[in-house]
C-alpha cells in the first residue's frame, strides 16, 4: 500500500509495546492473546475498520478442518499434520464460542452443524473416503450415502460440531473484548527493523513498536515482498435473498469440494456463495473488490437448479478478498531480517476455522520463540 506526501501532513510519532496490524478476526484474536495471556500493552491498527475485510464479508461458516476433504489432507500433509490442523479448528471454535458467551452484545450463532454435499458421483466417492478417514480418527461425523436434503446431491457428511455465525458481529466483539486500543482508517506503508524495535510507518502515526504482529491475510503481499508467492489474494462472491417463509437448508451447506456454500441467515434469508471455480482466471490473484457478472449469473442458475423453492428475489450481492496460502496451510513466523515482526496469515477461505488458534500460536512464537507446529513457515525450509 502507498500513502501520499499530503496524507502524512498530520502524522505523529508514538512509542508502543505491541502493534497488531489488521482488525479482523485474526487481528482481534492476536490482540486478545497478546494482552490477556502475555500481558502486553496492545494497539491495533487497520487500513479500514473492524471487520470490514473478509472477516465481515464471509458466509459465517465455522466448518472444521481445511479446504480439502480429510483423506486428501492426510495424503497431502501427512496424518499428523491433518489431525493437528483439525484440532486447531476445534480450538478456534472454542475461542469463538467463549467470545460469544462473554459478548457485551448479542452475536447470533446457529450450532446446528454443517453438511458437506457431493454434486457428482465422483465427489460422492470422495466423501465416502473422507468419512472413513474421519471415523477412523474418531472424529464425530455422520455419513449419508444419499442426499439427506432430496435436492439432487449424491451423498453427504454431517459435522455436528460446526456452526453458522454472524461473522461481522463476531469480529466486533472479539476486538471489543481484547481491551486493545484501536486506530482505524490508518494505512501501513513501510516497516523497518531497528535495534530492539520496529519502526512502522502508517498514514496517521509512525510507531516505534517493540513487537509487530501482521494479521493482514490477503493484503500481506502489499506490505512485504516476503509474502509474494506465499499468499495470493482471491475473490469470493455471495448473494442473499429477501426473507423466506421457510428454511431451505437447516445447516451450513458446502458442496463441489467447497466451491459452493449456502445457509439460512438469522433474519430468514437464504445466502449462496461460490462460482469461483468456473471463473478462476478473473477471481484468482486479485484484490479488487467488485462484483463479477459472470459469477453472479452462475449463482442465479445454481439457485434455480438446487433450490427452486427459493423464489424470493435477490436482495443484495457482494464480494470479499480471501488470502490463499501457497500450500493450503496458514503461515506463522517472523519476517526475514525483521525478527520482531510476526505474522498469522494465509487462511485459504477458512479463517473462521483457523484464525483464532493460528493467531494464538503466532503471538506465542513472536514473544517466546519456538515452533508453531504444522502452520510454522519453517516447513518451507524443510521441504
What do the predicted segments below correspond to?
Residues 1-18, 36-37:
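Extreme N-terminal leader/targeting segments of oxidoreductases
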Residues 36-57:
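Glycine-rich FAD pyrophosphate-binding loop
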Residues 57-88:
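Glycine-rich active-site loop/strand segments that organize a redox cofactor
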Residues 68-74, 98-173, 195:
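Flavin (FAD/FMN) cofactor-binding and adjacent substrate-gating region
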Residues 156-211:
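Helical element adjacent to the flavin cofactor pocket in flavoenzyme catalytic cores
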Residues 191-270:
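Flavin-dependent oxidoreductases
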Residues 247-336:
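Active-site lid/adjacent beta-loop-alpha segment flanking the redox-cofactor pocket in flavoenzymes
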Residues 304-383:
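C-terminal catalytic lobe of FAD-dependent flavoproteins
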